[in-house]
Amino acid sequence: MPAVRIKICGITRVEDALAAAAAGADAIGLVFYAKSPRAVDIHRAREIVRALPPFVTSVGLFVNASRCELGEILDAVPLDLLQFHGDERAEDCEGHRRPYLKALRMKPGDDIVGRAAAYPGAAGILLDTYVEGVPGGTGAAFDWSLVPTDLGKPLVLAGGLTPDNVGRAVEQVKPYAVDVSGGVEASKGIKDAARVRAFVDAVRSRRRDET
């Protein structure tokens, strides 16, 4: 099984970004959604991204942002990848000179394959837990048996992942990547370095067990 990529999302401090990178995370996520308790402004985001070591991907998370807002952020913050968590159409996600992920929230009976197909330009599809009125960061897991065997795109698994359950998630779903926020926090927006290390170790040890 190829190495599962790991993203630590909801980073609000330079020290948490560096701790995630030191633990072995492949990417960190910055939330540009004012209603989130993990939101960062342009100045803080730029400071965090500039502090990252080489080969750690910076991801910007957006929820129904306007093109003007996106352009202002992208002009100031050197993000590598965009992640859209709202009701964006494919055309809203494209044309920003960055690859993008589209997040889809899982509901029983939903045609998730059909919904994913509506974003042919996406670099990957992120599956998250559905909670009405909450675009992400719910801290709740969904039924992993609902995940299709083939979305036609790299699959990023999110939603309620923790150091205790991510190994099982990787074994069952076999995602391209996993994405965690609340599951490695001391409080909202503040990461617990020990939990970050435990999360990364749980993912990596699952791969070692299968080789």
Swiss-Prot record:
InterPro entries, per database record: Aldolase_TIM, PRAI_dom, RibuloseP-bd_barrel, TrpF_fam
Record key words, sorted: Amino-acid biosynthesis, Aromatic amino acid biosynthesis, Isomerase, Tryptophan biosynthesis
Pathway noted in the entry: Amino-acid biosynthesis; L-tryptophan biosynthesis; L-tryptophan from chorismate: step 3/5
Keyword Cytoplasm listed: no
Domain of life: Bacteria
SUPFAM superfamilies according to UniProt: Ribulose-phoshate binding barrel
Keyword Nucleotide-binding recorded: no
PANTHER family: N-(5'-PHOSPHORIBOSYL)ANTHRANILATE ISOMERASE
Reaction catalysed by this enzyme: N-(5-phospho-beta-D-ribosyl)anthranilate = 1-(2-carboxyphenylamino)-1-deoxy-D-ribulose 5-phosphate
MF GO annotations: phosphoribosylanthranilate isomerase activity
Name recorded for this polypeptide: N-(5'-phosphoribosyl)anthranilate isomerase
Its EC number(s): 5.3.1.24
Stored HAMAP family: PRAI
Top enzyme class: isomerase
Taxonomic classification: Bacteria, Pseudomonadati, Pseudomonadota, Gammaproteobacteria, Pseudomonadales
Species this protein is from: Pseudomonas aeruginosa (strain ATCC 15692 / DSM 22644 / CIP 104116 / JCM 14847 / LMG 12228 / 1C / PRS 101 / PAO1)
Similarity comment text for this entry: Belongs to the TrpF family.
